[in-house]
Amino acid sequence: MLGLVGRVVAASASGALRGLSPSAPLPQAQLLLRAAPAALQPARDYAAQASPSPKAGATTGRIVAVIGAVVDVQFDEGLPPILNALEVQGRETRLVLEVAQHLGESTVRTIAMDGTEGLVRGQKVLDSGAPIRIPVGPETLGRIMNVIGEPIDERGPIKTKQFAAIHAEAPEFVEMSVEQEILVTGIKVVDLLAPYAKGGKIGLFGGAGVGKTVLIMELINNVAKAHGGYSVFAGVGERTREGNDLYHEMIESGVINLKDATSKVALVYGQMNEPPGARARVALTGLTVAEYFRDQEGQDVLLFIDNIFRFTQAGSEVSALLGRIPSAVGYQPTLATDMGTMQERITTTKKGSITSVQAIYVPADDLTDPAPATTFAHLDATTVLSRAIAELGIYPAVDPLDSTSRIMDPNIVGSEHYDVARGVQKILQDYKSLQDIIAILGMDELSEEDKLTVSRARKIQRFLSQPFQVAEVFTGHLGKLVPLKETIKGFQQILAGEYDHLPEQAFYMVGPIEEAVAKADKLAEEHS
């Protein structure tokens, strides 16, 4: 049906074009071609077909041109709609093509989801009759798959009967939940100073070696333990080595369990060496896995995208290959649309939520670059990891003054939480201002009030550190998950001066404030 309608629209549009002069603008007709299939997409059906392979009797075409990752396919009848998946026949490995443009009445221009080496003109191509479909459901947990849903972890097929198309509409307004609610992570510095909203989008900024991966793994672990929720990790344009390391670290820390079905995370990888088509779609594959857990199981899902910049970069490559006129700094003209289409699907509905943590690479540290600038428009919170804090041995190395959150508002988090958070930031800012004086003149030159500020700030700084459960293997410290009430109470008491008599090392790498008191008593015993 879709193929037939797509055919009619294509024929009528191209008929209309014949009447135009050679210089007449084409975008309106091209827009019509692009919009028709999307408008006719049916509601998502997870068990619509037992396998994503093309159906018998599907429309067959043949390859007429191969230009790198772009493949032109000619169909004698039944032109496939935009975004349909086509499958090349007569190959050992599965090669999926996605329809990107209609060229005239019988030819489509497609983007390959894998290498096009060995393709020849005349090869047969089958229309699957639907967009790329991938396996979804609990069976994907603990597994790694690629953009088209094939397992790449050498552990056999993913045994699920449920498949879903990677392209879908964002939830309707009536389905969305408007309640603003904190997603408690159990990480003190995050929950207190830059809390995550359920269904929010968080930007994670950090260089190499400051603890991005460990923070991501702890979030996956804590969400599973505190909320019973699942996580999905989408590696977009990842280094293969880093993806491999992450997988093995997850096995070591128990986030992935190879022996039974208790794994808490599904992994989707589209590495740096993949063609641009795969890198531009792998984030949607990860999002589709997460949407199943939200919509069918009512879960609060965590979706990690590393790195969201690579999604934009791949889109830019695809756009250039399709011959579109580039926009600012050479990016695709549809940059905001591509980003918005994906980001709008990450939201809270009345059934569940998808909270997304997106690692963001900033090209040449230029925040005005169109790629990061477009991403910022969608973020609800930013978590900035600082090398200076990591050098002090304070982990997680989250910068308490640079990290922000849209829900840090007394009407959402409550006035007590808000006042404590602002009090903590004020005392840390005062300490930062005094550091130059301390470096030049020393602590003795400070007034008594300033000495007290410095003392409390150093205790707060250390109390913002926390032993992680996933890092127990490396640190030897027992990991701690701290409830929000305990976090607020602890910082409130430090600000009030209730623990001015305790040494600052008692606050380092502990969970709730009671542990700091117990550690201080233990230190006193050792010194006596």
UniProtKB/Swiss-Prot annotation:
Chief location bin: mitochondrion
GO CC annotation terms, alphabetical: mitochondrial inner membrane; mitochondrion; proton-transporting ATP synthase complex
Alphabetized InterPro entries for the sequence: AAA+_ATPase, ATP-synt_VA_C, ATP_synth_F1_bsu, ATPase_a/bsu_AS, ATPase_alpha/beta_chains, ATPase_F1/V1/A1_a/bsu_N, ATPase_F1/V1/A1_a/bsu_N_sf, ATPase_F1/V1/A1_a/bsu_nucl-bd
Single GO molecular function: ATP binding
Residues that bear N6-acetyllysine: K124, K161, K198, K259, K264, K426, K480, K485, K522
Membrane topology term: Peripheral membrane protein
Residues bearing the modification Phosphothreonine: T312
Residue list for modification N6-succinyllysine: K124, K161, K259, K264, K522
Subcellular localization, as worded in the UniProt entry: Mitochondrion inner membrane
Top EC class, one word: translocase
Recorded catalytic activity of this chain's protein: ATP + H2O + 4 H(+)(in) = ADP + phosphate + 5 H(+)(out)
Record GO biological process: proton motive force-driven ATP synthesis; proton motive force-driven mitochondrial ATP synthesis
Binding-site residues, ATP: G209, G211, K212, T213, V214, R239
Function comment: Catalytic subunit beta, of the mitochondrial membrane ATP synthase complex (F(1)F(0) ATP synthase or Complex V) that produces ATP from ADP in the presence of a proton gradient across the membrane which is generated by electron transport complexes of the respiratory chain. ATP synthase complex consist of a soluble F(1) head domain - the catalytic core - and a membrane F(1) domain - the membrane proton channel. These two domains are linked by a central stalk rotating inside the F(1) region and a stationary peripheral stalk.
HAMAP family referenced in this protein's UniProt entry, alphabetically: ATP_synth_beta_bact (MF_01347)
Subunit annotation: Homotrimer. Component of the ATP synthase complex composed at least of ATP5F1A/subunit alpha, ATP5F1B/subunit beta, ATP5MC1/subunit c (homooctomer), MT-ATP6/subunit a, MT-ATP8/subunit 8, ATP5ME/subunit e, ATP5MF/subunit f, ATP5MG/subunit g, ATP5MK/subunit k, ATP5MJ/subunit j, ATP5F1C/subunit gamma, ATP5F1D/subunit delta, ATP5F1E/subunit epsilon, ATP5PF/subunit F6, ATP5PB/subunit b, ATP5PD/subunit d, ATP5PO/subunit OSCP.
Descriptive protein name: ATP synthase F(1) complex catalytic subunit beta, mitochondrial
UniProt organism field: Bos taurus (Bovine)
